[in-house]
Structure formats: C-alpha cells, structure tokens
Amino acid sequence: MNYVEPRHQRSERDKAVTHRFWFDGLVQCASWAGDMNAKRWSMKSSQEESSERAEFAGTKSYEAAMKLVMKGWKKGREKLVSNVEAIALKKEMVTAPSFVYDVAGARPEVPLAIAGDPCCMWDANPLLSGQAPTHRLFINVSASCRWDADHLMKWGACILSVVDSLESQGNCSIEVNICQANRSSGGQVRSEFIVRLKEAGQHIDFNVMAFAIAHPSMLRRVMFGCMERVTEDHAEERMGSGYGRPDELDLDVLGATLYVPGIDKCGIDISLFKRQPVEKIFPRVMEGFVHMMEGRTFQGEEL
C-alpha cells in the first residue's frame, strides 16, 4: 500500500538517542509499520502468526489487523459505543451545569429565593458563554501483557466519554492523538510514535477510536511494526532481546495540554477494571482530566 512517510526527528542527549515519528492518521501509521519491503529489524514479532501471538495480539496476522484499520472493528465499535452510552446515562457524572448560582446574577431562581437562599441568582456558565479553548490530548497506548482487551476497552470508553462530554457541552475543543514510546534497558536508545486520530472540532469516529485505543493489535502489531522500522543507531541490538521497556513521553516535546499516561501508570488499580463496570471506573478517569485541566498530571501531581 502506498503511504506518505511520517515526519522523523532524531535527537541526542547525554549519549541517549531518541527517534520520534509523527503520523497524520491511523492508516498511514499502520501502512508504514507493515511495509515488509522497507529496511527493518531481523525480529518481526508484528508479523508472527503463531497461535500464541494471535492470542496475545488479538489478530491472526498483520494483514488481519490492517483489515480492521481499513474497514473498522465492528465488535469493538459496538462495545465501545455501548460503554460510552452506559456512562452517558449517569448524567450527574458527565454533565456540567449550563448556568451557575451566586448572590448576584441575571435573574432569580424563584424557589431558592423563597427559601431564603442567598445564592438564588443565576448566570450562564462563563465557560460556555466564552470562546471554548482548544486542547491537544495525547493518550499513551502502552500496556503490559497483564491488561486484556476488555480492560483496554473500558479505559478507552472512559477517555472518549470525557472528550465527548466536554466537547458536546462546549467546554472545549479537543484534538486527539495516541502515542507510544519504548526504550532500551539502559536508556541509550528510545523510539516514539505519535498518531493523530481527530482534529479539534471533528466528531469522534468510533471505528478509528475503537481499534486505536482498545484493540491489543494497535500495540502488539502496529506499534511493534513501527519499532521494527527504527534501524538507525543499531536500535535493534541496543534494545536487547525484545522490544525494550514502555516509556512515557515529554509533554513539552509533544506540545500537549492534556497527556494520559500508559494504563500501567494511570494510578488506577487493575482490580477495578476486573471487578467494576465502566460507569464505576469513569469518575476516576474524569478526576484525571480535572487534574490535567488544572495544570497537574493525570494522577494529580504538580508538573
């Protein structure tokens, strides 16, 4: 398949080399990662078709994963949408007020005034009446093998529900990107991949989002394929016997205003994903977004 080459940046700091690749869409990324005519590693786990790899990656082959990228992951889309709808039914968790009460305002709320409440006047929510800010969201799709597809689906549904809620209420407009990073055990070489999924102001395409955020093949086929194409600076040899260790990305380099870490580093225990329905997990994810919009990390730490 023909594709446009991604933008490639090479940087070096303290004898550690980073290769960073920027993609304008999921199809471009998957096509580049799957190009077997290009120079790549001798290890090709992304293309492996054993029964063990099929179970681990969620697809029998790279071609099967590519088909989901091109035509959509129907089962995943349906499950993602149902999870998002389940969250949306919990209106109190996602809906910001369209007006705010105070001691002064445009008009009174009569029942409150009769009851003697001093905060009985209301105005339009300033956030909604002003110009909505634009955010650049980056979601790290790194995940260790202990997370299965159902866990990733719940995680992705919660993130997309926050994005959908904030945009539909006019609180902000959000550009959505996924990213992934890996490094050698000694940190001498790193590779980073950034894929834009949605421009600010565009509607959420659940076909694209379901595969990109919740399918194991996004990491274990497509992103592994991306890693296999990083051949400069003896990357394969320096990674050791595998694909290195998952890593986080630098917010300043990304130009991110919102950054969701890999699910292993999100601060939410895996037991919650195993035991609880998605609407019970959502408040924790919403809390993470509140932290980020206050200028802190997803986990609530100071930047």
Model region roles, listed by residue range:
Residues 1-157, 161-303:
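Acidic, low-complexity intrinsically disordered regions
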